[in-house]
C-alpha cells in the first residue's frame, strides 16, 4: 500500500477506536450510568428478577368491543331445537 491509504486507514481505525471507547457505558440492568459498586450489583439483580416475575404473570384483558351475534350460533340453535323436536316426536 502507498503511504496515503495507510495513513487514511490508520486515522479511520483510530477514529473508530476513540468513538467506541468514549461512548455511553451501560451497566447492570441495561441502565445508563457509570460503574456500579459491588454492593449495588445484588440490588440490580434483585430488581431484574422482580421485573421478570412481573412480566411472567399472566395479564388479563377485557374485550370492550361489542361482538355482533354470529349467524352460525343462530343456525346451531335452530338445528338443536329441530333435533330436540324430532327426538321428542319419536318417543
Curated annotation (Swiss-Prot):
UniProt subcellular location: Secreted
Gene Ontology MF terms: gonadotropin hormone-releasing hormone activity; gonadotropin-releasing hormone receptor binding
Protein name: Progonadoliberin-1
Primary site of residence: secreted
Taxonomic lineage from the root: Eukaryota, Metazoa, Chordata, Craniata, Vertebrata
Protein family membership: Belongs to the GnRH family.
Pfam name, any one: GnRH
GO terms for cellular component: extracellular space
Glycine amide carried by residues: 33
Residue(s) carrying Pyrrolidone carboxylic acid: 24
Any one GO BP annotation for this protein: regulation of signaling
UniProt function note: Stimulates the secretion of gonadotropins; it stimulates the secretion of both luteinizing and follicle-stimulating hormones.
Amino acid at each position: 500500500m502507498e503511504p496515503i491509504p495507510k495513513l487514511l486507514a490508520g486515522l479511520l481505525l483510530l477514529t473508530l477506536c476513540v468513538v467506541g471507547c468514549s461512548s455511553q457505558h451501560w451497566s447492570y440492568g441495561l441502565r445508563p450510568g457509570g460503574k456500579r459498586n459491588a454492593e449495588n450489583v445484588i440490588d440490580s439483580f434483585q430488581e431484574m428478577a422482580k421485573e421478570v416475575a412481573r412480566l411472567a404473570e399472566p395479564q388479563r384483558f377485557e374485550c370492550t368491543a361489542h361482538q355482533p351475534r354470529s349467524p352460525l350460533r343462530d343456525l346451531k340453535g335452530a338445528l338443536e331445537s329441530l333435533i330436540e323436536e324430532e327426538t321428542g316426536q319419536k318417543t
